[in-house]
Amino acid sequence: MILVFGGTTEGKKVAGILEEAGYQFCYSTKTETDFQPGNYRFGAFTKESLADFCEEKNVQVIINASHPFAEGLHQTIYEAVDVPVLRFERSYPERLAHPLIHYLPSYPAAIEYLNTHPVSNLLALTGVQTIEKLKSYWSDHKTIFRILPRSVAIAEVSGFPAENLILEMPTDDLQHELSIIHQYNIDGIITKESGDSGFLFIKIAAAIHAGIPIIIITRPELPKTFFPVYDEEELLSQLNKILE
């Protein structure tokens, strides 16, 4: 059995590759999604429950195609299992040296930077799970969060003002991103290094086009034991080696 951690564009791609190749697999996401290939489960794993699941299902290899910022999951996989882990990586735009682009390693570092380089209206594109992480900033400074429509309840629990929410999916439409910047008088953006799948290149282009700074939280390092693969050929080659 192959266990796939998805919930991403990459996860869907992996599921399609495995189905076409005839591999038996279980597709797992943290929350229930509309994309549910044959053998599907959802819900967060603890170290203990993941270890039990892998033993019960005779999992021989894990394909981690989850979000690059799913740090809790990455650590759980690392600590819970001793089967091979393939990391199906997304592509990332090259980091750019530009006066408007600021790569920072953490949210505390971003808050510190914003406190010393204040903006009037910050557009946060870091996702609903980061509302709490940025609370010390938005409690005192105007911040607009764009989040998925299904995530409103999480924002409400955090006490974030509903009038400062934009409820929509990220887009690859530069003009749409610029229209948001102009509509809300945005003069600063914070986002994550989420790669091409997260349309990072569009967010950077929008900031540069509008002449406003963009803070990019750099993606966390993955455990060294995760073996990276970048396309279908590499994935199938590694699976053949592991499962032969």
Protein language model features and the residues they cover:
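N-terminal basic/disordered segments at the start of proteins
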Residues: 2-31
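N-terminal beta-loop-helix "entrance" segment that forms/cooperates
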Residues: 16, 26-47, 154-159
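A C-terminal functional module that forms or caps the active site or interfaces directly
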Residues: 156-180, 184, 188, 193-210, ...
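Anionic-ligand binding region
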Residues: 125-166, 174
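Glycine/small-residue-rich loop that forms an oxyanion/phosphate-binding "nest" at active or ligand-binding sites
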Residues: 51-54, 61-109
